[in-house]
Amino acid sequence: MNRRNRGSSSSSSRVSNTYGNRQFSDNPRTGSGGGVNESFQRRSDAPHKRNNEKDESKHKDEDPADVSLIVGTCSSMCPERERVTRERLRDLAVFERLYGNPSKSSTEIAVKKFCRTLSAADVQASDVRPLPVLEETLRYLLSLLDSKEHPFEVVHDFIFDRTRSIRQDLSIQNLANERVIYLYEEMVKFHVISHERLQSCSGTSISSMHHLNMEQLAKTLTSLYNIYDANRKPDYIYENEAEFRSLYVLLHLNPSSGVMGEPLSLWFRKLTFALVKSKEICFVRNLLRLYRMGNYKNFLSRTASEATYLQYCISEHHIREMRLVAVQYINNVCYKLQPYPLLRLSQNLKMKELDVESLCHECGLETCTDPDGFTVLPVKQSTFRSPEDKFKVYDLIGIERIKMSI
């Protein structure tokens, strides 16, 4: 792997102190790394309390944020000290094993793990990667996303942990410039794509992985929004900002999910006028209205014709919900003596006709052929049921256009 742009990041990579000190976790409540770590504050403040008056006078004008600032000097994706330790403990992921050896790795494939118990006393500049190395690390991780050698859940689990470590290193160094915005956007993409792909995986741990992925998606989005705001310029929207802001709205399609904490009514008040009027925000607001009205036809039609790939990935579960609602509506309210044509239903649900027939069967409904040879759905059937297990994912007509937007 080529090593480019190595070395410490410049001072321009850091926002002003108004952005706030952040703890060394990936909690994003007040920034890309979260609020102030109280234990870290105590460690930083204690020496000052013990200093004599002369020392206090000497340091009285220093900003605590500057005292704790760390500039990473690690030039590889994983600090040598960590790599050697994990080799000894045989703690290497499958992607980090040199020729499959569980106790041997290299600087080209070992990636720093996320540490849940990191404190200020543990941090050394040689263990922290500067921005150019973090950029290279993320490129390497995302290159594994389409790996066919291992199941997706294995790939996801590795990238999931290592991107948290990237966010942790960004937080330690208080990095939040435009290059960092790009890193966060790419990490959000990873979580969104994982959200969609994990739906098709099976296994006892998938439910937990899906929950944790959504949790980190929410945190990463919150961090990204904070960095957008910290770098805000008058009357300026970042190139992808409106699309990434729109994902917050889509995560509120189901208000009981509790994925994102702040109510939409409060969240919208914080957006700039330009963002509120952007086509991406207008689109998802309309989609939200259609979803809550149960207007499945327009919801699916607008999604197929206007959604980006990231918006589609977030909406996919709700697309399945709306299709179930539609089949139930048709079965309950249509005239019994006039079976409903599956061709018309497929057009409304943006599905292939054969897929609609399969969906009806999953819902416990029978289909038949009318005298003209068309497949129809007899209505008023008492056997309708919502599939108990995860039912099959059916393509949305228009998915080709959507996938081209990624």
UniProtKB/Swiss-Prot annotation:
Segments forming domain PCI? 213-389
Entry-linked Pfam families? SAC3_GANP (PF03399)
- Compositionally skewed regions (Polar residues) per UniProt: 18-30
Positions of region (Disordered):
1-66
The record's statement on gene disruption is: No visible phenotype. Sac3a, sac3b and sac3c triple mutants show no visible phenotype.
Q: Where is the composition biased (Low complexity)?
A: 7-17
Indicate the segments annotated as coiled coil, or none if absent.
none
Q: Where is the composition biased (Basic and acidic residues)?
A: 40-62
Name the Gene3D superfamilies for this protein: 1.25.40.990
Family in the record: Belongs to the SAC3 family.
The free-text function statement in the UniProt record for this protein reads: Possible component of the TREX-2 complex (transcription and export complex 2), a muliprotein complex that functions in docking export-competent ribonucleoprotein particles (mRNPs) to the nuclear entrance of the nuclear pore complex (nuclear basket). TREX-2 participates in mRNA export and accurate chromatin positioning in the nucleus by tethering genes to the nuclear periphery.
Record protein name field: SAC3 family protein C
